[in-house]
Each structure stands twice: as structure tokens, then as C-alpha cells.
Amino acid sequence: MSALPDLRGKDLSALTPKERYRILCGILPTVTLEELLEYRKMICTLVPQLRPSLGFDQRSAHHRYDLYTHVAHVVSLVPGDLTLRWAALLHDIGKPVAFTLDEEGRGHFKGHAPLGGPMAQTILREMGAPEEQINRVGFLVTMHMARLSPDEARLRQLVERHGLDAVTQLLALQRADMQSKGVPGEEQVERFVAVAEILEKLKS
């Protein structure tokens, strides 16, 4: 249970970005899915850039929820690490901007991840977040659609470039993102397990 219920009745819109950041840092590690859904308007007041996600119909067979509800599920599914939860909260921030419809009325979000990375960094920078956190969230948001393959040489290169902790967090974000869309296929589950095993091996 987070401190979200205690904020009811307060004028959150009058808070400075730094004050909103401090509140969210106190909330995110322990917030539940139920709270994220019940207090969705409150969350979107604390992060106004999330407002377009409220009720946003993704028009896709790959998504069973509106955009905000999907984001809420992802936040609740990743571990309670603060930086990882910030990345989960902002991972699809680029979707409303990237959204297009094809001739059959299906929604597409081409390039939303690399578009969203800098957007997430801008949000956190305006809130006064530490630069290390800004950089990590930017990496995770930008890369959350990149396929992690169980190829030890490639994973080793990725780890050497970004660090084992960052790549481990990326895997956690991708797993949560996939789970929130429905039951992952057998191939996806096996791939995630294989990647996790290689990352565990690289720790030694």
C-alpha cells in the first residue's frame, strides 16, 4: 500500500515539479495495480504528460487494455526498484505522438520507444531527478522494444556497453510489458528464461 490515498483532497496541480517528483518517489516502489487504477487522475496530475494515455484506445489486437491501464499493469509487474518503476511508468510515453491508423483501422506506434526515451528524460530532468536515473530511464524506455536474444556474445556486448544492472532491468521491463498484453507465448517465455540464464552467468 502506498501513500496515494493520503493525497486525496490536496491541490496537486499547485505543486512544483520537484515536489511532484518527491511524492512519486515515495509512491512508486510500493504502489499497487489497484491504486494506480483507482487514483489514475491523481497520477496524471503528478505527471501531466501521462494524461493523453487516459482511455487511449490502442486499436490493436496485441493490447487488451487502454494505454493508461496497460502502463499501470506494467508498473505493478516490475520489481519495486524506484528507477525501474519510473521507466515502467514512462515506457510508452511516446505512443500517443507516434500513433497512426492503417486502412483497416488498426493502430500502430512505429518508433514510439526511441521517441519516448528523450521524452521520459525531459520529464525527469524538469522534475530535478538525478542524472544517473535520467540516463537509466532513458535507456530503458528507448530499448524496451528491442528484442533481447539469448545470444551470449551479443548480450555480453550489451552488458559491456550499458552495464549488467541496466540490461537486467531491461529484461524485467520487457517481461512485464509482454505479460500485460496477455499470456506470453511459449517461445517468448523460453527466450526470456534463456536471456535471464545468460545474464546470471555473466555476473560471475
Regions found by a protein language model. Name each.
Residues E34-R40, V47-G55, A87-A88, D151-Q157, ...:
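Short coil/turn segments at secondary-structure boundaries
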Residues S53-F56, R136-H144, R191-F192:
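A glycine-rich phosphate-binding loop feature that marks nucleotide/adenosyl-phosphate handling sites
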Residues E35, H70, L89, Q133, ...:
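General structural feature for long, well-ordered alpha-helical segments within catalytic domains
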Residues G9-P17, G111-H112, M143-L148, V195-S204:
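Short, mixed-charge aromatic SLiMs
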Residues L12, D66, H108-H112, H162, ...:
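A generic short alpha-helical patch detector that favors 3-5-residue windows
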Residues V75-V183:
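Divalent metal-dependent catalytic cores for phosphoryl transfer on phosphate-bearing substrates
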Residues M1-D81, R85, I93-G107, P118-G128:
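Glycine- and charge-enriched loop/helix tracts that form the active or gating conduit
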Residues S2, K181-S204:
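Terminal helices and disordered tails flanking the catalytic cores of nucleotide-processing hydrolases
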